[in-house]
Amino acid sequence: MYERDYGNMLHLVSGVYIPFDIKWKNIGVSVSGGADSAMLAYVLCKLITENDANTTVHIISHIRMWERRPWQRKNSLDVYDWLVGHFTNITFKRHENFISPDLEWGSQGATLIDEYGNINSGDIIEIQSFAKYIAHRENQDINYNAVSHNPSTLEIDNRFLRRDIVFDDSEKTRNLIIRKHGDRYSCHPFRFEEKKWIISCYKLFDALDLLDVTRSCEGDNIDYPDVFKGLDYKSYKDDMRVPTCGKCFWCRERDWALTCD
């Protein structure tokens, strides 16, 4: 049914359907600086190039946890610069948003009601709202997000349970991949793909140099002072080499994916 409803815009990429209409003039992609969002942006740029589409790519990045992890802005800029340098045929625009640490899920939890009537955290509402604003301002046809599925063969504490849902071709799960909001689409094409598939794409497309630019670690001096040794917004400089903790969910997920065939 998924193929029936969106068949005219589906492109098979390493066994996974990626919705993209070559007639679209403006697309938005959330890019954090991590491996998942960087690969999604890469795949979309690849489709634009292969189909000679006249599509502007709007990269949306959020400054988050700026006091604890000030390097995250540099991570997203590094990915953006890589994309611009490698896809010189494409017009890019970057849009940067700021999210107060006080609104993050880790600070307050899910305490607010979003526009769809769901209980959500402030950061999620802010991300959705900013994407909607940019989509309207830039007349975007679709906005993409690279949220992926939890590892199926790795037990990790603090996993996000909403990433465990299984695709069953119901309307509910199809809507988690792509759905229409008014005149525009919202799309999570990696929603049911694990990070091992995403890492395999880096190998398949010979884009390991892009993977090297990305950062998955969500650790910082508060949680792992033995690793970060006091590093925060007061001492961080953009030319610093920032360590990875190797212990957080995101580090362990990435390490697991890199060892998968």
Give a label for each model feature.
Residues 2-261:
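Nucleotide-activated chemistry modules centered on ATP-dependent adenylation/adenylyltransferase
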